């Protein structure tokens, strides 16, 4: 394989991020459907994070709109990352920074102390995305 083939190869870390955002797409879609139809067969998913259910219930129908927006953003991020597009890269960075801010607020405010687990994870993912080699993939990808 020549040098040209290597530069266009999709890095394993990018594939992992594509899977992460695809899972985010599914999770946000299921959340939106569950919030739209409370008490449905999807209700047990909230046992994973009852605090989220309580918070979403407090904000009412805006939670459904929020989850649909997250779902759409995850779809576009997944596609953009898979195709190696700069806009996909920047969507991923923005979504992860927003997630990081949310985790920090949740931990500091005491709303969701378990969010502390997400802080270093998002930090590592952002560090990966900000690496020169990763940025190069999105600046020069022909995929």
Show the residue positions of the predicted features.
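Topology signature of small-to-medium multi-pass alpha-helical membrane proteins
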Residues: 1-143
């Amino acid at each position: 394989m020549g040098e040209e083939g290597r530069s266009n190869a999709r890095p394993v870390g990018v594939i992992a991020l594509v899977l992460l955002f695809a899972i985010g797409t599914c999770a946000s879609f299921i959340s939106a459907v569950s919030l739209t139809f409370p008490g449905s067969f999807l209700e047990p998913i909230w046992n994973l994070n009852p605090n989220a259910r309580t918070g979403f219930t407090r904000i009412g129908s805006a939670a459904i709109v929020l989850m649909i927006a997250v779902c759409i953003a995850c779809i576009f991020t997944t596609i953009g990352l898979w195709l190696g597009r700069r806009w996909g890269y920047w969507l991923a960075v923005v979504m992860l920074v927003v997630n990081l801010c949310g985790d920090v607020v949740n931990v500091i405010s005491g709303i969701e102390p378990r969010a502390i687990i997400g802080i270093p994870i998002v930090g590592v993912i952002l560090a990966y995305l900000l690496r020169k080699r990763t940025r190069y993939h999105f600046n020069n990808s022909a995929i």
